[in-house]
């Protein structure tokens, strides 16, 4: 994905800046303040994407460890609420999208020590929430559009991994990098539905069209795995790749596990956790596998900034970057070479 694409549609981002800039003329601009010496209560606004939600988990764990007994309220979309709502130390987990009465009551009734918005850029939704919340200190990552309605503007280094950027608040309270990956215990409560030998988990698809990888190239990679190891392949795919997955199942028969019994992220976690490694161009599963401490081969575009921010965090990985903005231009030979090296490393470490 090019820098242009990685910014989630420049035209949309431009419109978002226009809206946030207009809101800054309506909302009260806040004076700069110091962070409190200790935090007793905090409300955090979580980003919309699944991968971003997974990357926020290490921060939440570190926050609770640093301030035992802290009251943590977390706002998220209904889409990724299941990731957070079972965490025992989160007091309230409420959806801000779609907007609802429970969320409205919460942000109007509570008084927090700190509001924290860890999003790198502007969001009209986050701006509206921030303006409504009662907090002694409102904290964001430094951004000229965000800054006017926040008291504290933390460093916003785009060369940092997103997991570490989320932890900028805790850097002021003695946290050091790299931060430890973490998943709530319920991610480990769903065993793999595959129980007939070793397998490689492989995610064929991702959300954006520029991240699509051709069927014939997947076929070449899968054929190599099956011919040069005793492992099978467990296929994850979206509805758009269903026909491709079915064709692979027809060709390789019982050596392909598809369809998978993974109706949600928890079941997918069980399958990935018991795999030998993950091959994926979907960063959501890459971040999940990293949190599970599974070896990863990730497929990325030539967008170095995007790679730096969303590569597998703090885990054994070999990643393949395209020569262009499109993942489809990756030569399958490069993936195969990295797979062979990864298997050799895993074999050596286990002997």
Report residues per predicted region.
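Catalytic machinery of carbohydrate-active enzymes
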Residues: 1-351
């Amino acid at each position: 994905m090019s820098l242009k694409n990685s910014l989630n549609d420049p035209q949309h981002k431009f419109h978002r800046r226009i809206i946030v800039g207009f809101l800054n003329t309506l909302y009260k601009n806040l004076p700069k303040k110091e962070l409190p010496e200790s935090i007793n209560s905090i409300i955090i606004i979580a980003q919309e994407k699944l991968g971003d939600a997974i990357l926020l988990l290490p921060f939440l764990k570190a926050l609770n460890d640093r301030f035992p007994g802290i009251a943590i309220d977390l706002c998220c979309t209904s889409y990724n609420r299941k990731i957070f709502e079972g965490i025992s130390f989160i007091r309230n987990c409420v959806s801000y999208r779609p907007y609802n009465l429970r969320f409205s009551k919460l942000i109007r009734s509570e008084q927090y020590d700190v509001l924290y918005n860890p999003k790198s850029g502007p969001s009209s939704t986050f701006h509206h929430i921030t303006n409504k919340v009662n907090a002694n200190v409102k904290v964001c990552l430094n951004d000229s559009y965000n800054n006017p309605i926040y008291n504290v503007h933390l460093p916003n280094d785009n060369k940092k991994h997103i997991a570490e950027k989320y932890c900028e608040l805790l850097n002021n309270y003695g946290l050091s990098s790299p931060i430890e990956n973490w998943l709530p215990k319920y991610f480990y409560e769903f065993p793999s539905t595959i129980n007939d030998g070793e397998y490689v988990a492989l995610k064929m698809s991702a959300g954006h069209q520029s991240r699509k990888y051709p069927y014939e190239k997947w076929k070449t990679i899968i054929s190599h795995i099956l011919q040069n190891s005793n492992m099978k392949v467990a296929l994850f795919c979206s509805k758009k790749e269903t026909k491709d997955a079915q064709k692979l199942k027809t060709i390789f028969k019982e050596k392909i596990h598809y369809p998978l019994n993974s109706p949600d992220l928890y079941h997918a976690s069980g399958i990935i956790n018991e795999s030998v490694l993950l091959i994926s161009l979907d960063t959501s599963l890459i971040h999940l596998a990293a949190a599970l401490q599974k070896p990863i081969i990730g497929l990325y575009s030539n967008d170095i900034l995007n790679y730096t921010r969303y590569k597998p965090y703090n885990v054994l990985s070999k990643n393949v970057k395209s020569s262009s903005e499109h993942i489809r231009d990756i030569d399958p030979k490069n993936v195969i070479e990295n797979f062979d090296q990864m298997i050799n490393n895993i074999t050596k470490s286990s002997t």
